[in-house]
Amino acid sequence: MLGQLVGGLIGGHHDSKKVKGTVVMMKKNALDFTDLAGSLTDKIFEALGQKVSFQLISSVQSDPANGLQGKHSNPAYLENFLLTLTPLAAGETAFGVTFDWNEEFGVPGAFVIKNMHINEFFLKSLTLEDVPNHGKVHFVCNSWVYPSFRYKSDRIFFANQPYLPSETPELLRKYRENELVTLRGDGTGKREAWDRIYDYDVYNDLGNPDQGKENVRTTLGGSADYPYPRRGRTGRPPTRTDPKSESRIPLILSLDIYVPRDERFGHLKMSDFLTYALKSIVQFILPELHALFDGTPNEFDSFEDVLRLYEGGIKLPQGPLFKALTDAIPLEMIRELLRTDGEGILRFPTPLVIKDSKTAWRTDEEFAREMLAGVNPVIISRLEEFPPKSKLDPELYGNQNSTITAEHIEGKLDGLTIDEAINSNKLFILNHHDVLIPYLRRINTTTTKTYASRTLLFLQDNGSLKPLAIELSLPHPDGDQFGVTSKVYTPSDQGVEGSIWQLAKAYVAVNDSGVHQLISHWLNTHAVIEPFVIATNRQLSVLHPIHKLLYPHFRDTMNINALARQILINAGGVLESTVFPSKFAMEMSAVVYKDWVFPDQALPADLVKRGVAVEDSSSPHGVRLLIDDYPYAVDGLEIWSAIKSWVTDYCSFYYGSNEEILKDNELQAWWKEVREVGHGDKKNEPWWAEMETPQELIDSCTTIIWIASALHAAVNFGQYPYAGYLPNRPTVSRKFMPEPGTPEYEELKKNPDKAFLKTITAQLQTLLGVSLIEILSRHTTDEIYLGQRESPEWTKDKEPLAAFERFGNKLTDIEKQIMQRNGNNILTNRTGPVNAPYTLLFPTSEGGLTGKGIPNSVSI
């Protein structure tokens, strides 16, 4: 320290040299366009001497005037700013910058930037080309920098050399600590657009009590009855009528909902997102206009009526010339509108499930196959006792055990008895009974009329599943304590019995669609990841190796979740309008969260818990599947193992002992906050890792990355391919099963297709739902996929870079294996009767509606 003090006092006497650098930045923009007026005012400020300055911070030379922290260099400024032409289209611009440097200053470890212009800009990076005795120093920034008067403290960026807290150069430690203090905020005040503060709140902003009782919604989180993961705090004032509810912003300002500035969509993604929405709105409105002149404006009269949503449209020119022209257009929105992938304008794209055959979706084989390779392949479980038993409290709900009997399924088990089939791991169940029964009575007071379902299936010798029976249950009319009334349906393909069987499968699909959207998709990926995003930014410095590991897997998550709270999962939002639980949807997801267990989100643990795999140390991934041809599980285990190998290599480079884990104060604070605040309603659960060993860190990070990337991809990007044709996965049922002797039963006999369509999702709901899932199923053009990074220089450490390259190569190998499996005719579940190859866990993709690709994060 004495040497540093002396150096700081005498350093100015040494000859100064120049170090040149390159700054890459993007000016303020509106979608695809640069804000030209803002650019002009910035040039005026520049001419008046109000510039953008950079000061390097030494990691070896202290400054007595600055509390012996790292010494600052003289300010340097963007070169030729006034002479650089402002591009019309939003994009990156590189500027030179030259710093004074002397030998005592040594290696810069950080820099301070001050923006004296009037507008913000996006700072991508600063690269110092040749620091004497050191070489290139790279700073990955990727942050919006607002005018300095917007900040209470300096904006600081660190070089790409990771450090554990105890290894941080002493002169940089205070800067590291202060930056985290800034990001945490003080928990007060309304957040503004330029804020960078990450904080927590409960879901108290879904309702709007100021607009009447029908818009009141239960607060999710902070109670034993309705526990929930926390969301990002906005600090908006409370509503007038309920001080515990947060007020909402007007719908027209939805895109302005607060998230920390660097969590907002980039301009390319925002352009794509709005373009997809625009196209879907047009596709939604036109059929509605046609319906005004239809005798049954809110009904599809036939399956041909439904198919007209997809066929036709305005086809754009094809070929290399037109593609070259559109690729040359600098504006992303126009490029997306003129896509040349075969989609027509003004019509929905044909969903994959009906591309090859318009009727194969109705087969029992396809109905069962989608439980293994569809959009919700995470529910099916092995049947371990017959008949199935309920776990609901009998004091509250009476006898909820299944009424399926041996007579319903015997004779369909390829010569096996029920006990033999169970012991041979041949019987499986899709069980939505216990999840729905507590809410079903209330749900059926709305326009929804549906059941809680159990579906039994038999694993055949060819690897495919055969439905055996469907049980549909309603709460007992005399009260919950009396249990349920149930009816069991068995397969038939003839006459009215065949039509009833098709309806029974539709009720199962309605159940599965709602559980998928609320639980498998929203709760188990979007909602549970957000606390990890917040805690990582609050407790792990950008210098921390684990921050660098996890950061790509949090991209855009807070923004898409905030938009969901604003327009999708709110009272009267799109989700309530299109899924069967209606206004009870989010409350129901909170009850399900009571049973959420973080370690069980690991794919091997999930498969074992559902009984579709058993632990087996001799198997490649530590588990052996009991359904060999289970596309989601087979591909998923390959992806899981690749992620775990990568995380193991990475974490092992930084942590070699339990002691290093325990003494890492940032890591311990991060994990404590995840447990006690972010997922605070489950803080006392015994299954949380103690974070005392490198293996606990590896397991936890692997699970976080799996949830954010592959699990989300598996349950999201198949939405349009499988549910874009609503008869295959209806989201609502409006009528109960027709009973003999009723007009509905007679219609079912005379016109079964029309009776089917009058039972499931109505025309308006169908169009709204299809419009939504088309948007959610598309990849934006700036997507970053598993095994990719936004910057190749995300870390300076060579061993992690080499491990990451191995990870990418492994994913490429997995892609080849997936293609080989899809081409294997013996694996019938890979494509099924609809001839739809399973590609949802294929790591990479192009932009658009592709049905493949694993983005790094929950980004849509």
UniProtKB/Swiss-Prot annotation:
Keywords: Cytoplasm, Dioxygenase, Fatty acid biosynthesis, Fatty acid metabolism, Iron, Lipid biosynthesis, Lipid metabolism, Metal-binding, Oxidoreductase, Oxylipin biosynthesis. Its cofactor is Fe cation. One of its GO terms (cellular component) is cytoplasm. One of its GO terms (biological process) is oxylipin biosynthetic process. Fe cation binds at residues 521, 526, 712, 716, 860. Belongs to the lipoxygenase family. Monomer. This is Linoleate 9S-lipoxygenase A. The gene is LOX1.1.
